[in-house]
Structures are given as structure tokens and as C-alpha cells.
Amino acid sequence: ISKLSERFEVDIPQFFANPTIRNIAANLKEDANIMLRKFEQTFAFKQLKEINETEKREYQKKYAKVKDVLLLGATGFLGIYLLHQLLLESVATITLLIRADSMRQAQNRIKKHYEYYFGNGSYDQYSHRIKIIIGDLTLDMFGLTENEYKELANHIEAIINSAALVKHMGKNSEFELINVKIVENIVDFAKNGINKDIHHMSTIGIVYGANMEKSKTIFTEYDESTLDGLENQYLRSKVKAEKVLKNAKNQGVQSSIYRMSGILFDSKTGKYQINVNESSAYI
């Protein structure tokens, strides 16, 4: 797909809907200006950087008091960097819920990912502040026993969710399970035990949909997302997840949504994500 995109406009959903050479060839549109537009888009997005420092400081002051954080999706590219920053910039205990057959396997998995990005020995420096729980986010009560679930719900003060299927292609059932069902389970968890805010990582792609080439506008978590014009399975599932959070917010569950753009590599170290071949961000 990457090679084809250098010369042609590629409709990715159509590409995978009927992945035959005849169908792919019939749907390719050659465009001599495609690279020019890509460069124009890159420079346009580079200029869209505006931060409200006062609001940011107040936000950081509020959450500096949080002592127990549940971080989900910590083995992902974004998740591992969130873990790193939480360890560097807070004194909180970070609980990770990881799917594994044993505690040793779970520990080795998170250590492998952490040290891949931050160097040998970096994990051991902070391991005393990392609490690992074996579970499955797609299952009711995260696959925990009732007592384990209640205990977790009674001491976690904030939930950061970066767990997601980001392949942009695959079965609808997979996207629904990982990108929507997990968020429903997180909301159920937030309703149990002490009050806890949800911080959900979404994608900037849902803002544009079929209107991506139109003028940019301000779009926040207070605005209603829509499925109109979104044929991409990944984007549709992320819109549905945001709707779950919006409905929960109307019921008193506090949540914030952070819409990420393409995260490609660490600009300081040059490290790319481990599963670079599975992410369409590199197409």
C-alpha cells in the first residue's frame, strides 16, 4: 500500500473489502500532484499548534494530587510513553492491567517494551512504583474476581485509557471489542468504588471524516462526533467509544478526551514503535 500511495490515490477500505488484483487495479487513481498535497498537508498541520498555558498549569496542579493511577494499554507506543511520563513527573503508583498467562510473563512483557524505548536498566529504576495486575479489558470486571475488582475500584483515583486497535483495517468485530467494549467496561469500573476520572485517548481523524479537506475548525470533547462520512472501521469504532463516554458523562462519570494525530517516532531518540508493520500511520 505504501508503494502504491506514492503514485496513486488508494481507498484503503475498498482495498481490503475485495483484495484481488482486478479490484485493486480498477480502483486506483493516478495523481501526479499527490506528493505535493502530502507536503502541503504536512506544513499546514505543523502550523496548527496553540496551547493555553494557564489552563495547562491548572490542569497539572489538579492531577498532581492523584496518587493511584490505572493505565491501560501500557504496552502500546503511546501507552509506554504515558507510563514513562507518569513515572518522571508524578509520585503516583501506576497500576497496569496486562493480559498474560503469568505474572512473570506480564512483567517481562512490560519490561521489554519499556527498555526498548528508554534503555537497559531503565525499568528497574521505577519498578517499585509499578503495580501489575493480570486481566483482560474485554471481559466483564476485567476478568478479575469480584474481590479483586472491588479492591481495585476502591483505590484507583484516575484511569488513563490508551488501549486500542489501531491497525485501521480488520474485522468489525475486532474493532468493536477492543475500541468500544473496553470503553464500556472502563465506564462500569469508574462507577464502582471511589470517584475516578477517565482520560481517554481518541484520534483526531474522527473530526474530519469526509470533510478532511475543508477549513479547519475548533472541535472539542463537548462537540458531538458523527459517523457521517466515516467509512474507516477504526475511526467509526473510535466515534462509538466517544459516544459511550458522552452518555456516561451525562450520568455523572467524569471523562476527558484527547484526540491524537499520527504518532510516528520519538523525535529525541529516533525510536519507532515496535509494531511498525501493523500500524497504518506509516503507510
PLM segments and residue spans:
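C-terminal beta-strand-loop-alpha-helix "lid" module of Rossmann-like NAD(P)-dependent dehydrogenases
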Residues: 271-283
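The catalytic Tyr-X3-Lys active-site helix of short-chain dehydrogenase/reductase
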Residues: 91, 232-240
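Conserved Rossmann-fold NAD(P)-dependent oxidoreductase catalytic core, especially the SDR/UDP-sugar
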Residues: 154, 158-162, 169-177, 181-233, ...
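Structural preference for long, well-ordered alpha-helical segments in enzyme cores
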Residues: 1-4, 20, 27, 74, ...
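Phosphopantetheine-dependent thiolation modules in NRPS/PKS and related acyl-activating systems
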Residues: 1-56
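N-terminal Rossmann/SDR dinucleotide-binding element
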Residues: 34-158, 162
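Conserved beta-loop-beta element that borders a ligand/cofactor-binding pocket
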Residues: 242-270
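Conserved structural-core and active-site-/substrate-pathway-adjacent residues in large, well-folded domains
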Residues: 4, 24, 72, 94, ...
